[in-house]
């Protein structure tokens, strides 16, 4: 054999082998070592998914680990996303808009529920009968969450300003405790704490408005979505499995909610009965709902003056991933 021919072809084979190795390495690097998600008592879908381990099952063959972190509210989930402590976080839609407007690079990619998860509550024997009666009163709410924004919108439509009341900033569970101990006059509650307070302490719903409850959004960091689009799809596929299971098994879902959140089955049933799991396809409907709700963020100086909230909302909502779950459904 010609020596030059041998050397040339040996070199080509070596380069081909290196190229193959690099290709394999690149493919391996295209998947993360770990997917980090939150779970939340206000998101029954996350509890069912965590309970059955369906995401772990789905990514096991890829060698990807799954890590779960408890979120006590939208504000916590958004803090974790901003700090890169989690890749996926469960929040209310308007809370996600507020966070994105203030610089948190997230994308909302899935609707895990359409809940009536917040309302204004007062103690069972309270003399307060209307929202107007709240003037000069102490009201607990968790800043940066749907209940807080619900409170601001409720005050506005009832002719009150934020300065007309004293807002006490407490996490959801602490707000419930403060209401039941008489330290505050009213509370912008969140399920399941709200349902627990109704059933166990007799707390009374003072003001309800389903339209002021924004959707439950699953958010992902922009960085994760860009680097690992296939894993975003895998997470949504797992969420879909959990959502469909809840629709088919409401009693069992209530029991899982009760066990995970450490609440009574009766409370869990109340929470699930006022939660709509029918439409996960994020898109136009959700943009329009958020555009209608967003002005309160500017009116209350929660975002910088001049912020283009329509652009923020359009940049936030990304239907491209959920469309792959059901091509015949239009999410745009």
List the predicted regions and their residue ranges.
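Short, glycine-/small- and polar/acidic-enriched structural segments
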Residues: 29-161, 166-169, 185-188, 205, ...
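Pocket-lining segment of extracytoplasmic ligand-binding domains
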Residues: 94, 167-168, 173-259
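Conserved C-terminal helix/tail region of periplasmic/extracytoplasmic solute-binding proteins
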Residues: 298-332
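Sec/Tat-exported extracytoplasmic proteins
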Residues: 59, 85, 90, 100, ...
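Solvent-exposed, polar/charged alpha-helical surfaces in well-ordered, non-transmembrane soluble domains
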Residues: 57, 79, 83, 97, ...
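N-terminal secretory signal peptides and thylakoid transit peptides that target proteins
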Residues: 1-15
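Secondary-structure end/capping motifs
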Residues: 228-304
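Sec/Tat signal peptide C-region and signal peptidase I cleavage site
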Residues: 24-28
């Amino acid at each position: 054999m010609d020596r030059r021919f041998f050397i040339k072809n040996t070199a080509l084979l070596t380069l081909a082998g290196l190229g193959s190795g690099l290709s394999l390495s690149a493919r391996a690097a295209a998947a993360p070592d770990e997917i980090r998600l939150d779970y939340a008592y206000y998101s029954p879908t996350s509890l069912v998914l965590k309970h059955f381990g369906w995401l772990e099952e789905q990514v096991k063959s890829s060698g990807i680990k799954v890590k779960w972190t408890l979120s006590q509210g939208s504000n916590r989930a958004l803090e974790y996303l901003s700090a890169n402590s989690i890749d996926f976080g469960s929040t209310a839609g308007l809370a996600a808009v507020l966070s994105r407007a203030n610089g948190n690079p997230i994308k909302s990619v899935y609707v895990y529920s359409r809940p009536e998860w917040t309302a204004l509550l007062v103690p069972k024997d309270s003399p307060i009968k209307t929202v107007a009666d709240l003037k000069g009163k102490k009201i607990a709410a968790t800043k940066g969450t749907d209940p807080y924004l619900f409170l601001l919108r409720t005050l506005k439509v009832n002719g009150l300003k934020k300065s007309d009341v004293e807002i006490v900033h407490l996490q959801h569970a602490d707000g419930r405790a403060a209401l039941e101990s008489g330290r505050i006059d009213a509370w912008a509650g969140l399920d399941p704490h709200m349902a627990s307070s109704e059933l166990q302490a007799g707390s009374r719903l003072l003001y309800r408005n389903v339209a002021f409850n924004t959707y439950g959004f699953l958010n992902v960091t922009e960085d994760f979505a860009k680097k690992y689009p296939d894993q975003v799809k895998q997470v949504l596929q797992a969420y879909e499995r959990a959502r469909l299971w809840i629709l088919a098994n409401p009693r069992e879902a209530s029991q899982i909610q009760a066990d995970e959140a450490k609440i009574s089955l009766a409370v869990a049933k109340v929470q699930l009965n006022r939660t709509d799991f029918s439409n996960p396809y994020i898109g136009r409907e959700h943009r329009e709902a958020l555009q209608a709700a967003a002005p309160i963020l500017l009116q209350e100086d929660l975002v910088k003056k001049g912020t283009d909230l329509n652009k923020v909302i359009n940049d936030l909502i990304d239907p491209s991933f959920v469309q792959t779950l059901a091509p015949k459904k239009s999410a745009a």
